[in-house]
Structure formats: structure tokens, C-alpha cells
Amino acid sequence: QPATMSGMVDLSAVSPAIALGPLDGRYRAVAAPLVNHLSEAALNRARLQVEVEWLIHLTDGGVLPGAPRLSETEKSYLRGVVEDFGAEEIAELGAIEAETRHDVKAVEYLLKRRLAAAAQAPGVVGADGGPTVLPTVGEIVHIFCTSEDINNLSYALTIRGAVEQVWLPAARGLVEDLAAMAHEHADAAMLARTHGQPATPTTLGKEMAVLAHRLRRQVRRVEATEYLGKINGATGTFGAHVVSVPGADWQAVGRGFVEHLGLTWNPLTTQIESHDWQAELYSDVARFN
């Protein structure tokens, strides 16, 4: 008879949690730098950042009729919510999502809670020097956005961070190590082959230089990656935007926001950003590997 789980310890109840795969298990020490970029918590922090910056972008630009402009202390408070995102916020977000059953909506609700709490935050005042208006702008949060508007930008930010702060430094270091070995062993003669048969000699340094040259080329391709983003609504048409605020140049608003995040504007999409840039990036990384 095959073995069953009957009578066995329920491993899902063990604390601390058992890793589901080796990246979070035996290789965790090696993969740890990626936690700040590619973990679920890092993704939610990026989502919170996008929601905050979208709110600031709309109010700063005077796009929404009647929406108040935010003071510098109010913007600083909002960005501080992102900077302070940690264990307490992760737990709170998990509790919210247990009710919403929707990850992006949970982030939206968390931000609305922080907006409501701004009235008690020391030093946060409105643009006129009076009480902060943050508790009154909760319904502007996520306005005109579909979840993919938030997600595509958040993934672009987190992937860019992982590539630029973790992968590229490691890749450049490997290339430089190979280049140094190529110089060190430039005169170390060794047998070369053609068609599996002994041929004219080569050196160990030259063969290491071949590898360094190939890898350096892939590094340049990764360095040139365009991290694309869009924020054009549920079908990629700015439909709700134009109906609600027909006088705004929504292409310019969207482009300005995406570029403000340090990403490249994708002007034509469906509901989702096409993700072609991700396929290109992963192909470059695969060739490096």
C-alpha cells in the first residue's frame, strides 16, 4: 500500500515556516539579496509605492477638478508610508487580504488607512498651513486604475531593482574575474582540438578570454533593457479617464507618470502590458547562464 499522510506531522504547521522550494531553503543565504526585490513583500511595497506616486501625480498636476494639492509634508508622509513598510505592515496587509481576497485591493485599503491616520501624524499640515487634507482624499486612491496598471509597474520596478542591484553586479564581477584569469594565464599553453583531433595549440588565457567576451556581450544587452510600463486603464484605451475628465491629455499624464517612476512608457497595450521586455530580458539572462 502507498504511504499516506495519516499520523504524520503536518509540516505546514511548523514554525518558522518551511520553504516550499530550495531557493528559500538550502540556497536562502545566496538568494537573500533578492528578497528586497522579488519577494511577495517587496512586490506589495512596490504596489504601495505606485499607488502613492499616482495619488501625488494626479494632485500635483491638477488633473482632477476639485482635488486638493498636497503639501510637501503630506507628500513626505505618504512616501514615508512606503519607506516604513515592514513586518507590521506585512502582517496588516495579510489580514486585509484575508477579507478582500484580492492582493491589489488590500494594498489600496492599507493606504486608505494610512491616509485616515495622517490627521494624528505630527508635523503633517495642508498646503495652506492648516489641517492635513490626506484623510479626505481616500477615494482618489487607485482612481482610473485597473489592477494591471499597478501590477505591471510594480513588477517592472522590482525586476529592475533585482537586475541592477543584484544580478548585474554579480555578472560584472564574474566577467572581470574571467578577464583577470585570461591575463594571468595568457601564456599557459594547452592542447587545442578541431573535430575532436589534436590541432594547433592555444593558451588557457585565450580560452578564458573567449568566455569573458561572450558574457560581457550579454551583460551589455541586459544593461540596455527597457523596463516598460503602462497606466491606461482596463482595456488600454483611457476610456474611464476621458469620460470622467475629458479635458486632460491622458497620454501625457500616463507617460509622465511612468517616466517619473524611471520606466519606459509603452503607449499601446491591451488591459495588460505586453511583457515583451521581460521575455527579452530573461532570454539575455539565459544566454549569460
Question: For the regions a protein language model found, what residue spans apply to each?
Answer:
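A helix-coil-helix interface module used to build multimeric assemblies
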Residues: 6-241, 245-260, 265
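Active-site-adjacent structural elements in folded domains
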Residues: 265-272, 276
